[in-house]
């Protein structure tokens, strides 16, 4: 390892695609390359003692007011903070499923505190750059990444159907309605020549021929399976409002990396990165425009192949994991500097406030579980439990990988 490798602690609300892509993947790679010493934990497990060992603390999508002491301890002790945000929670409807998780008044107040106090705020879209910039002068917009090492070559059979894919981790999905009339029309006309797949949300009842793939909670495993499936055309609808314009271009990165010709809503998330007719097709959010784009890519195999190749090249040149890691390392070095700070952090009182007795935590979970059952039903709650189990296992494996380098003096 170099003479000084910054000690970076990432405190995450949970493991999800955003935290995995933006924080876990690059930090683990930098740790294993000896450029930093990283420790990754969940905010429900974190302690100010973790901050006492850090030269930099990284948060991502954290909004829980009951864990505010973690941020406040870092600020009070002079440890720089990087806050990563790829969704505009200020624009979420508070009565939506995501709004109940991220956009209640107390959560938005906590988000404001994070954004105001951070040494650097990292965002992925121009609307979020403007929104965060009103609270903090140190905001940087970066391009997201995709790990091309996880992409597999599909075994494509000549003469088979053209495989279409719509993929999202949202189980309560409304964006698919944008293209559904066009897809239904195409499938009625083409029959077995077209094979449509939904990955994540279940397809609507009016499209019984659509094949369904369940959510894969481990993102690397998802990318391997997704890329190996041999999809040729990908659908990426997006609403034209402030919340959705604040998102990152994950679908372009995934489709491009996997050699899929994408059809994208013509909103700035995609129009800023997609070259129409070269790396994808940009379409208005109406049924006729989506139908024409679908028809064009199904009928024109040469255009389809050209877009697949050009999109893959675009991802390799601008969105690779290695590029993102170099940006992250630059940010770490700028925030930490070359001299490790010396400080004493009093953590005992804060630890006592944060760490509830195990029985108290279990009792607090009971009404939350009952409320989840009432709102979502058994199937959705079971899926949530599977997600928790998968995340717990993934976190344990991560910490095992990081432990040796982290514990070195």
What are these regions (language model features)?
Residues 274-277, 281-287, 296-302:
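Conserved acidic donor-binding segment of nucleotide-sugar-dependent glycosyltransferases
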Residues 296, 303-318:
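A short, well-ordered alpha-helix in the C-terminal region of glycosyltransferases
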Residues 10, 14-33, 145-151, 157-229:
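Conserved catalytic-core segment of nucleotide-activated headgroup transferases in glycan assembly
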Residues 1-67, 401:
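N-terminal pre-catalytic "stem/leader" segment of glycosyltransferase-like enzymes
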Residues 316-317, 321-408:
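C-terminal amphipathic helix plus adjacent low-complexity
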Residues 91, 174, 219-257, 263-274:
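Nucleotide-sugar-dependent
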Residues 73, 89, 101-120:
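Membrane-proximal helix-turn-helix segments that form the acceptor-binding/catalytic region
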Residues 116-152:
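Donor nucleotide-sugar binding/catalytic pocket of nucleotide-sugar-dependent glycosyltransferases
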């Amino acid at each position: 390892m170099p003479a000084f490798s910054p000690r970076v602690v990432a405190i995450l609300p949970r493991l999800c695609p955003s935290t995995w892509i933006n924080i876990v993947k690059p930090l683990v790679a930098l740790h294993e390359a000896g450029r930093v010493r990283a420790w990754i934990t969940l905010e429900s497990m974190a302690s100010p003692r973790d901050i006492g060992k850090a030269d930099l603390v990284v948060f991502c999508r954290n909004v829980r007011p009951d864990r505010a002491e973690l941020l406040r301890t870092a600020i009070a002790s002079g440890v720089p903070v990087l806050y990563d945000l790829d969704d505009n929670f200020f624009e979420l409807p508070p009565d939506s499923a995501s709004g109940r998780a991220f956009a209640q008044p107390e959560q938005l107040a906590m988000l404001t505190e994070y954004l105001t106090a951070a040494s650097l705020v990292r965002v992925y879209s121009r609307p979020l750059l403007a929104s965060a910039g009103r609270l903090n002068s140190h905001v940087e917009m970066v391009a997201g990444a995709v790990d091309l090492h996880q992409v597999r070559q599909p075994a494509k059979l000549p003469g088979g159907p053209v495989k279409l894919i719509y993929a999202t981790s949202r189980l309560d999905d409304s964006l698919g309605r944008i293209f559904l009339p066009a897809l239904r029309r195409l499938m009625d006309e083409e029959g077995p020549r077209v094979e449509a797949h939904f990955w994540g949300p279940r397809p609507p009842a009016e499209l019984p021929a659509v094949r369904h793939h369940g959510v894969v909670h481990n993102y690397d495993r998802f990318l391997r399976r997704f890329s190996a499936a041999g999809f040729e055309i990908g659908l990426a609808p997006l609403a034209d409002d402030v919340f959705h314009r604040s998102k990152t271009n994950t679908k372009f990165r995934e489709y491009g990396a996997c050699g899929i010709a994408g059809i994208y809503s013509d909103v700035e998330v995609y129009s800023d990165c997609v070259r129409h007719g070269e790396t994808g097709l940009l379409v208005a959010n109406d049924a006729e425009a989506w139908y024409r784009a679908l028809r064009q890519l199904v009928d024109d195999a040469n255009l389809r192949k050209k877009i697949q190749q050009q999109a893959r090249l675009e991802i390799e040149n601008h969105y690779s994991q290695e590029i993102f890691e170099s940006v992250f390392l630059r940010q770490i070095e700028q925030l930490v500097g070359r001299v490790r700070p010396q400080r004493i952090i009093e953590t005992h009182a804060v630890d006592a406030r944060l760490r509830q007795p195990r029985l108290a935590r279990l009792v607090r979970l009971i009404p939350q579980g009952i409320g989840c059952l009432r709102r979502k039903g058994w199937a959705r709650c079971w899926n949530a439990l599977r997600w928790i189990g998968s995340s717990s296992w993934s976190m344990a494996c991560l910490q095992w990988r990081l432990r040796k380098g982290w514990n070195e003096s």
